[in-house]
From Swiss-Prot:
Pfam families: HGTP_anticodon, tRNA-synt_His. It is found in: Cytoplasm. Its EC number is 6.1.1.21. PROSITE patterns: AA_TRNA_LIGASE_II. One of its GO terms (cellular component) is cytoplasm. This is Histidine--tRNA ligase. It catalyses: tRNA(His) + L-histidine + ATP = L-histidyl-tRNA(His) + AMP + diphosphate + H(+). The keyword Cell cycle does not apply. Belongs to the class-II aminoacyl-tRNA synthetase family. Gene3D superfamilies: Anticodon-binding domain, Bira Bifunctional Protein, Domain 2. InterPro entries: aa-tRNA-synth_II (IPR006195), aa-tRNA-synth_II/BPL/LPL (IPR045864), Anticodon-bd (IPR004154), Anticodon-bd_dom_sf (IPR036621), His-tRNA-ligase (IPR015807), HisRS-like_core (IPR041715), HisRS/HisZ (IPR004516), HisRS_anticodon (IPR033656). One of its GO terms (molecular function) is histidine-tRNA ligase activity.
Amino acid sequence: MAQKPSIPKGTRDFSPEEVAKRNYIFNTIQTEFKGFGFQPIETPSFENSSTLMGKYGDEGDRLIFKILNSGDFLKKADKDALANSDSLKLTSSISEKALRYDLTVPFARYVVQHQNEIEFPFKRYQIQPVWRADRPQKGRFREFFQCDADVVGSNSLWQEVEFVQLYDAVFNKLGLEGVTIKINNRKVLSGFAEVIGEQDKLIDFTVALDKLDKIGEEGVKKEMREKGISEEALNKIQPIFNLNGNFAEKIEGLKTILEGSETGQKGIEELQFIQNAIEEMPLSVAKLDLDVTLARGLNYYTGAIFEVAAPENVKMGSIGGGGRYDDLTGIFGLKDMSGIGISFGLDRIYLVLEELGLFPATVTENTKVLFINFGEKEALYAMKAVKRLREENIIAELYPDSAKMGKQMKYADKRSIPYVVLAGEEEINDKKFTLKHMKSGEQSNLDFNGLSGALK
């Protein structure tokens, strides 16, 4: 019995309709990227493991897909690691390459490798797939596209302002209202760790804090205790959990909490600059909100942190995110190169637009007219018209076989082709075409110019 074909969990096939809708999102994002002055690049689907490992924290490293070395990889495997079931040590001896986890670290590698060819500040966008060995769930896949925009070579806070505007511009074009752009600052998080005397546990602290929405206040505190953060420190951070109000009110609360931290106060100043600029240039469909628990458990953000939440009436995780990473290129030997970037979560944006019915009907339009095939002579006459229509940017097809007319009409109906053309011996003699509207059944006898005009 033949094996039933399947695809790996966390991956998907896409139908023509789905591809058309995805391309609508891609094109919308790409148009705005270009409008904001970003240039496109592409990087390989896999990188050297040394490029990726250690850049995303322990959690991220575990989600990187490793690629086995070519040939008999076990010959060069670490025998002690194999005997002792030491998976980490064994992996490094049998795998030297890995599928990219995101587009940001490969971009940092690109900048360092091509620094002599780049004009700084360098604004780039990149739309390519990434892979993560995550547990699949709604809106979370093991293979998915990221749509990134980054700027390197400038530490100006106007870049942060511009990225907020970029998010808003894209969601405005997609007709997606009610999106919340959450913002925080890594310096604020460092300030929290400083005022409670736990600077050495900053990563543990922020990773736990970032889970507040998922596991609640008590869950966060429990995880912090497990990481060795003292009860006294937990009492000091209680005001963080009680911080609420609008952006300005939260800022005032932060000033009190971080009164003893110079780093934290610097983070507050940066947040205020961004908020003041956005107030002067109001957003169209999105809302900017300060979320002091937002940490995005990655190792490379050093300033602003962004996360985009879908409208409240849609149950969905984040649909975008990013931040400033002043030290990212430093890991590849290029020091003092400040950068900031954001990413759009295409797959989740797709699900949100689908759920809210926001895809325009025109997105899935394909062939405009199908010519019925009555035989070789008629097919040649039809094909000449098809060629001319295509030259006028009208999508036209000839049914390939001279099958029964009912079968051809059914084919047009199943594919939602709005028009069919009948061109038999009579039409050929008169140099005409019979155009039929599939829904209404209305027919018109037209010359080519009339046919072309009716289809435009």
